[in-house]
Amino acid sequence: DKNKFLKKFKFIKNYLDTSEFNGKPILTVSVRENLSDFYYRKSPKAEKTIVRAKRMQGIDKTLDDGGGITSNLEEIFKSINIFDNNIPILLNRFVSPLSSTLATTYYHYYIMDTLDVGGDKCVDLAFVPANSESYGFTGRLYITLDGNYAVKKVLLNTPANINLNWVDKLRIEQEFKQMSDSTWVLDQENTFVNFYVVKGTQQLYAHQLRNYDNYNFNVQNADSVFGLLGALHVLPEATAQPDTFWTHNRPIPLKEKEDALKDLLGQLRKVPAFNAIIKTAEILITGYIPTANDKKVTKFDFGPMNTTFSANHLEGFRMRVGGMTTANLNPYWFASG
């Protein structure tokens, strides 16, 4: 009985929040946090990211080991530079409304109003692509009216009538601030997205907030950082930071419903049906059945499940049993069959 099944989850209404994107009710099921130091050198050009702390909470923690879910979200939430001529999003290149080569021919601009944005008087400049089916944004530019004509804020929306694979709607908001030496720098970046895991199923909502602070234009011993191999470095203690660390170092507090995620997960795990759903989803996504409840302990997994049962006209129904060892048995040698 559907009503009897849903009654087991009636406590969920206490954890509902409202989407900042479209105002619809949402349930926070995953929170990921990352605290990093970003280094940039203009000449020779180099970029390095040192991850000081990172953690992941939510139902997807058991479903994802940095694979499909993580890689897809990272592709969506790549930081952009509004001042570049082209902005890459999901393997597509969008013309920037500030492009020095195409902006004035690619977009139509409309002065909407003058208003205060974070203490700066700005002109509200709307823009739309000249061709509604092209890879351009709709949105707003807020330009300061103090004589410098700096970009204070920008809103970018992807048009509804273009194909972005499994993404339905995407919005990017950036705000800039002026430093004491008059330099303008990126202050905050918000990305909102509605997307599907499977087309035709319930949409998912994701929101990423990036906060930029503690700018330093005279970094000591920067050569030692740029001498590191690779662009990304995760400190050994990054994933082991306690709650107290996040409380003191998180630049913006979690929202009430985000902070209540641990309580929500505790309630959900008391419902046997939820655990069965998660276990089934884990098997479907990974293709393997672990021989232990904890992924950090299991030494052998059965699978892949998509080849366990098969049938054809010549051989009829067939069943095979297979599996493979994990890094918990030996991190260097693996066996499968």
Please give the residue ranges for each predicted region.
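Structured extracytoplasmic
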Residues: 1-124, 128-136, 194, 198-310
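Short, hydrophobic/aromatic-rich segments at coil-to-beta transitions
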Residues: 118-126, 150-155, 183-188, 331-335
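Transmembrane beta-strand segments that form the barrel wall of outer-membrane beta-barrel proteins
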Residues: 127, 155-159, 300-311, 321-322, ...
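Mid-length scaffold segments of soluble, non-membrane domains
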Residues: 133-145
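Outer-membrane beta-barrel channels and translocator barrels
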Residues: 146, 179-181, 328-330
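Short aromatic loop motif centered on NTY/YTY
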Residues: 158-159, 164-209
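Residues that define the transmembrane beta-barrel architecture of outer-membrane proteins
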Residues: 170, 315-319
